[in-house]
Curated annotation (Swiss-Prot):
Changing residue 44 to E/G/P/R: Lack of secretion. This is Protein YukE. Required to deliver LXG toxins to target cells. Homodimer. Keywords: Coiled coil, Secreted. Disruption phenotype: Cells lacking this gene display an increased bacteriophage SPP1 resistance phenotype. Loss of delivery of LXG type toxins to target cells. The WXG motif and the C-terminal tail are crucial for secretion. It comes from Bacillus subtilis (strain 168).
Length: 97
């Protein structure tokens, strides 16, 4: 049995836009962290500094993947909104004959 759809295409698009904004915010945060690491490396030298920077570099791909996933959700919600809108119109056209 199908569930009840309680969302409009406009609401889905608005939510998609929010996911897109959050995706960009993650990338902005990565840029800020890159600058902070660079600044820190100019003040802190040695093995511990290198270990800290290496640890960040190992984590950075996860941040990028998070941004990519948020962008994927953005696109999926947009596609769902388009499908919902199109399907509703198709049903209306069938009813009209």
């Amino acid at each position: 049995m199908a569930g009840l759809i309680r969302v409009t295409p406009e609401e889905l698009r608005a939510m998609a836009k929010q996911y897109g904004v959050e995706s960009q915010e993650v990338l902005n945060q990565v840029d800020r962290l890159n600058r902070m690491i660079s600044d820190l490396k100019s003040m802190w030298e040695g093995a511990s500094s290198e270990a800290f920077a290496d640890q960040y570099e190992q984590l950075k791909p996860s941040f990028i993947k998070m941004s990519d996933l948020l962008q994927d959700v953005n696109q999926q919600l947009d596609q769902t909104a388009n499908t919902l809108e199109s399907t509703d119109q198709d049903i209306a056209n069938q009813i009209r004959g």
